[in-house]
Amino acid sequence: MAAAGVTAGAWRYWPEQGFWNPCRARLPRRLASHELVARAWEGLDSTQVWDCHAHLIGTGDSGSGIVLNAHMDSWLSPVQYARRLFFLNAGCAHEAHEGVDRVYVERMHNLIDGMRPGFKLVLYAFERAHDERGMPDPEHSDVYVPDAYAERVAKADPQYFEWVASIHPYRADAVHALERAKRGGARGVKWLPSAMNIDPASARCDSFYRALSRLDLPLISHAGLERAVLGRGAHDYGNPLRLRRALDAGVRVVIAHCASMGEDRDLDKGPNGPYVESFALFARLMREPSYERLLFGDTAGMTQLNRAGPALSRVIEEEAWHSRLLNGSDYPLPA
């Protein structure tokens, strides 16, 4: 009886199309012509509509430099292996026996062609985890997507893509790499602190923050619980309050997903402060007048089952925040 109850309760969360992405060429007509879709585009200049949070994934089979952790290709690590399959299926590259990098990019072309003219995706590079000495830690890096590859893909199809760099601030060449990314047209820098082993509140980030401010590049940093990419698993580094150091240095900060999942310590009440919802800490930062022109959030993934809820309702209802929210999908995760 208990098992039946659990099954019945879970059924309401079962996706209509199942858990495997059917990889349709375009949005079905009944959805593309739906009244809500038409209203969403109403009054918008589609050339100004970007998906500001999209991940560039592959296997490195094109010479891209992408590296997947060996555990993601081994049945001996079933969770990691399944994660790889889900990511590739989400990007419709799961059946590509060769040319996975190419097929993944072609799928994004296909999806953009189904949008309004001028729409773009902002593609993210993804840095390795690094140790405290600033050296790469491949054993604890789930995926590595080089800046050079993200730049190359974006520049090959500028009508489709922009790109964002990913640079670990502990690297000896971090500022130099940031300056190089700026010259290459990067629109910002992406961090996933818990996976990459970055403490945003560390003084080791100060020179990087000064460079970000000088170059007028935003920092897009994940905050709150992370489940898709584990890496070093340093969850405390995803606390939204740890980004105060960047904000106080004059850096524009985009808190990815509006920190809409998980709990973190309330560091404003001391290092051993109580755990509260990560989103509540994001909301606190958004209320601070000194951060009004510096702090933003993105909506990436917030409509997904694991995030949809009170946080999504709040960002919709909080009209004062709307001019500080960036549109994002967290592609390919929605697929």
Report residues per predicted region.
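N-terminal export leaders
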Residues: M1-G5
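An N-terminally biased module of ancient metal coordination in phosphate/nucleic-acid-related enzymes
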Residues: G9-Y124, H130-S141
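H/E-rich (His + Asp/Glu) clusters that bind or coordinate divalent metals
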Residues: G18, R26-A32, M261-A335
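Active-site gating/metal-coordination segments in enzymes
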Residues: R26, A32, K120, A125-D236
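Hydrophobic faces of well-ordered beta-strands that scaffold small-molecule active sites
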Residues: W50-A54, L121-L123, E162-A165, V189-W191, ...
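Catalytic metal-binding/acid-base residues of hydrolase active sites
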Residues: H53-I57, H168, S194-A195, G224-E226, ...
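A structural motif corresponding to the C-terminal end of an alpha-helix
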Residues: L111-F119, A150-F161, D248-R252, L285-L295
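Distinct, well-ordered alpha-helical segments
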Residues: A172-K182, P200-D206, G231-R245, D264-E288, ...
